[in-house]
Amino acid sequence: MRKKLTALVLSALPLAAVADVSLYGEIKAGVEGRNIQAQLTEQPQVTNGVQGNQVKVTKAKSRIRTKISDFGSFIGFKGSEDLGEGLKAVWQLEQDVSVAGGGASQWGNRESFIGLAGEFGTLRAGRVANQFDDASQAINPWDSNNDVASQLGIFKRHDDMPVSVRYDSPEFSGFSGSVQFVPAQNSKSAYKPAYYTKDTNNNLTLVPAVVGKPGSDVYYAGLNYKNGGFAGNYAFKYARHANVGRNAFELFLIGSATSDEAKGTDPLKNHQVHRLTGGYEEGGLNLALAAQLDLSENGDKAKTKNSTTEIAATASYRFGNAVPRISYAHGFDLIERGKKGENTSYDQIIAGVDYDFSKRTSAIVSGAWLKRNTGIGNYTQINAASVGLRHKF
C-alpha cells in the first residue's frame, strides 16, 4: 500500500510542475481575392527644344487572383513560477502555424521571452513586441494574409517583435510606461527593400527583401494611460543608423517599387518614429484614432531630410453576435531628400463584419481598397476581399 501511494505521488509531480502552463492560440483561414490597377502618365517629350502637347496615359489592370490562405494562425505556451516575496518568473513561447501549408520553420518566431515580474514591474528578454505593435491592436483588428491592403499594412510598418530586452512599469493612477532596447547585432534595421522585376511579357516577379548588416542599436519607449473607457498610447522609436531605403513605402511593394531608386538603399541617420493613439470603449462601441510621424536624415553630405505623416481611424459596434467595423488610413504627401513629393499620398478603406458563432469561433468577412499616388497622374490601386473562419483556444 505504501509503495502504491509513493508511486502515485511521484507520478503526480510532473503534472504539478506544469500546472501553471497555459496553451493558447488562434486558427484562422479563408478565401481571399484581389486585383491590382495602375495608371502611368507620361508628360510630353521635348524635341529640338520644343515641348510637345500630347500626354500619354497608360492604364493596366490585373486579373482577380483568388486563393485559400492562412490568416495568421499561431500557437503559444506561457507560464509563471512564484519565486517568493512577490517575485515571479514569467515566460512565453509563440509560433506561427499555417493551415494552408508551409510557414515558419523555427520555433519562437512570434513573441517569445523569459523574464521577471514583481512590484517593480516586468522585465523580459527575447522576441518581445514593441510599443507600436501594442498600439496596433486597437487600430488594426483585421485578420488577413494580405497585410498591405486587407490590413493597415503601410500604417503599421513599424510594428515588430525584435530580439530585445523590455521593461514595463506598474500602473500609477492610470499611467504606465515602458522602454525597450535592441542591440545592433539583433537589429533588422539594415536591409535592401523588396521590389518587383518585369520580364519580356510584363509579368511581375517579386524579389524579396534582403537583410543586411545591422545598422545600430534601436531604442523604443512607450507611455500608456487608461481611465474607464478611455485609453491612450504614445510610442517612440529611434535608431542612429538605419538602412531602410529611400522611401519607407517601397517596403510594401506598391507605387514606384519597380524604379531603380527603390532597388538601392541609402543609409538613413537619426531615424525616429512617433505614434499617438487614442481609443474609447463603451458597451458595444469601440473607437480608435492614431497619428504617426516618420522622420529621418539621409547619409549624403547635405544630410537632406525625409518625413511621412499619416493618420488612421477604426470604429466598430456590436449588434448581438455581429460586429461590423470600418477602418480608414491616409498618408499625406511625403517629403524625400528635403523636397515634397507632389501627389504621393495614399488612402485606404477596410470594411467588414465578424459574426460570433460562440465565444471562440467567428466568421470573418472584409473588403479593402488601397490607392497609392506615385506622382502627378500616376497611381497604384489594390482591391481585395476575404471571407474566413477564426477559432480561438
Swiss-Prot record:
Keywords: Cell outer membrane, Ion transport, Membrane, Porin, Signal, Transmembrane, Transmembrane beta strand, Transport. SUPFAM superfamilies: Porins. It comes from the Bacteria. It is a multi-pass membrane protein. The keyword Ion transport applies. The keyword Transferase does not apply. Pfam families: Porin_1. Disulfide bonds: none annotated. One of its GO terms (cellular component) is cell outer membrane. One of its GO terms (molecular function) is porin activity. Homotrimer. Belongs to the Gram-negative porin family. This is Major outer membrane protein P.IA.
